[in-house]
Amino acid sequence: CLGIAMACKVPLFSGIIAGVIGGIIVTVFSGSKYSVSGPAAGLTAIVLTSISQLGSYEAFLAAVVIAGVFQIILGVLKAGSIGNYIPNSVIKGMLAGIGIILIIKQIPHLFGYDKDPEGNEQFIQMDGENSFTELVHMINFITPGAIIIGLVSFAILIIADKPFYKKDKILSNLPGPLLAVVFGILLNLAFKGYALLEISPVHLVNLPTIASITDLQANLFFPDFSFVNNSKFWIIAFTLAIVASLETLLGIEAVDKLDPDKNESNTNKELLAQGIGNIACGFIGGLPVTSVIVRSSANINSGAKSKLSAIIHATLLLISVLLLPNLLALIPNSSLAAILIMTGFKLTKLTIFKEQWKFGFEQFLPFIVTVIVMLVSDLLKGVCAGIIVAIIYIIKDNI
């Protein structure tokens, strides 16, 4: 949430608002059992451009409200069925691509180099590097303490994924990611005073401090509808609605593929939920929300059984920001990086590549094109490239 807010150059609390609304309001109305919604990295470029064109964040929030109305209309018109036509190979490629991006993006954080905001998935980064050059650049800024915390977190996550751990009555109630974070905090405290190992504050979770009602009010922004007579305003609102809806439909299709129970989500209901969520975000200063594949896959991998897990996640996020900011500020980014890298490995297993290859070149090419284009651009461009390749094969087979 915070990393995306930083990448969008908006108040940090705007990301928190989006995470809370996405986790509670959207989840309540959602047509998916496991989808988790929140601010999306894929909308970063649109947010930056839109704020620049409209001249203020408040005017942009008004566009988010109207975008939410458009999404509700799309849901009523049953536009959610579009997601059913996305080729399976492209969905698999999207998941594998996200997994690789997660791994590449989190390696610098694991080593204690945090120039690129946590949560930013764009190829071209805010610090002027790209996803690959960052890996070379970080070598000069390695933090030994961060590496130790990251490796310990990895060890905990690997052990927590073993059958003996999952079958034990006591251990099975202790989620691996939670233990990794707890041990990360303890090691961070233990390293204090040791110059070589001590973790600098810039390598720790950074939350906005809300100490009073006045602080809360200062972090809330409200929409300015004075631009409704401007054609740019409506173009931005419509663009937001379409892109956010496409990301959501892609996310829902991906979640259904990951769902161990193979539930089929109601995509039209999901568009309605996203619309309601974006209207709420726009009215109190939150970034636009979509279904977020990384959050959703982490939700499934953590053993979620119902919508309640997403609601609890968002509630804890809100409580933590309001009541426990000092405790959360002790969490090392390297612990979180280890958790996300493990999620990435689960999304991009070698078996997925072998499976797509066995299905033949007509399945493998859209899959691998989706992965490659995603790595050097973004999710939507990768999916569009994969769909185009899949369509070419369909036309070729029917000539």
Feature-to-residue mapping (PLM):
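Transmembrane helical cores of multi-pass ion-transport proteins
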Residues: 1-398
